[in-house]
Amino acid sequence: WQKRRELKRSINYICSDLFAECMAASLYNGTPNPEDVKNLLTSILTMHSSYICRVSHVEPGMKASVYFQDLKTHFNKDVNDVIDQINGLH
């Protein structure tokens, strides 16, 4: 359980940082489209909820180590996508 707690904590920190970066970019990076900012913030919150739930409920029939490695890979990809979107706010 300790590892799951650490993984959830990491997800919380990363998503919080992404949310803060998105807010900062929207305030200090020119005048981005408010709808784009809203959609990006919503996607960060949705991503957070989704991954926290996935940590708690391992896929049946799948080895835990494989499941969590896959989860981390997908999370990292999603984080990089969000970072690219934040960088693209104009």
List each model region and its residues.
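Generic structural concept
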Residues: K8, N12-C15, F19, L41-L45, ...
